[in-house]
Amino acid sequence: MDRMLLTRVLSSILLAFISVAVPASAAPASGSPLLFPPNPLPGIEAAASPAQSSDARLPDPRLKDAYKFNQGGWTYVHLEGTPEEVGFQHGFLLAREIEDNVHVYTVTAPHEDKRPWSFFKQAAKNVLWPHIEPEYQAELKGIVEGLHAQGSTLDLWDIIALNGDIELSNYYLPTINKKEGMPNPVAAVAPGKCSAFIATGSATKDGKIVIAHSNWSSYAEGERWTMVFDIVPASGQHILMDGLPGVITSQDDFGVNSSGLMITETTLPMAKGFDVNGIPEFERSRKAMQYATSIDEYAAIMREGNNGGYANSWLVGDRKTGEIAYLELGLHNTPLTKKKDGYFVSSNFSADPALIRDDTPGFNPNNFESSMNARHIRAEAFMKQHYGNLDTALAEAYLSDHEDSYEHKIDAGKRSLCGHEDTSPVGEKVWGNAPYDPGGAVTGKVMDSDMAARL
């Protein structure tokens, strides 16, 4: 099956807001259940409708405003209330999915990171937990309470480790290995592997913002990266984002808030450094999406307490003003560029010279054979070709593009904007990926200002 053929999924609930394009192979095939099949939970009454394959309305007062349903391979989850209530709803509604998600990491950690899951749980307790704000501590505890109400034995440190997996395994672990004089596992490096753009003004068909993002990950993770979280917190902005079961931020990242901020990112390549006294990235990215009402506010929240974990190039648009921004968030350098006319592309390359020097010293901008630079070249060519006409349809074409700019041919592989690492006979050396690595683009999402306005 050609994974690059995208299936456009438009839930009637999401229709007014977001166009979600999913690679045909990303969603589990019928008859191929996950480790913990999403069977109806105890007490759930299904209510079928054209828009909803199942609807959960539960008697517990903490769950009165919560529900979920499945559509087109996605699970739509509505959470509403105090941090404790939002967390409880999350844990209760997605208990089986969270169990399954944690299981993936407990299996892969010893192989990829050469450390048992218990190592990450201990780091979650000692390194991350002390720096998480009370609001999000309460939400995380709520997830555990919801899990326990469904009979799960997962504990708080499982959930913190799940939320912090990327920053612990790819940023914290290398610093510990260096300190202990241990070799760093090939897989324990800052990941790359996402493609995105944001455009506005004369670059787009209607002069408004268009944003697009594809999530590249292992297929073990990607099969589970199928949540759409609709969160109405007691304080802050109403937010809509994709995500993973048990994780309080998008982590993908793709979302919008009711103030009109449109947000995504791609990971900075080979980022180094981790501040154990900083605020976890998963909290900062959630807080920024929930509370920021402008690009400057968003950047300020992401910069405050920056621990260097999960260092990303953030693409942010403000629907209210039409302004877009590019925030490279390294540990030592965090340059912010804004414009009201033009575009930014992102494909896991570093742009700022000081950031390359201090934060991503392993990145070689002149290695055009690498995935990140080859995609950068193709992304720029796509923007120039379609400048002035960019809309959601062209955004989908961008995410499904298969051109290899290095070999000058159509080839669905590691160098195409829509990634197929599993078809590539040459692994991506800078990420330590072997040939035919089982990973690639697993989801694609596009949005424009008009969609964002209807949240």
Model feature map: region roles:
Residues 24-31:
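Boundary at the C-terminal end of the N-terminal hydrophobic targeting segment
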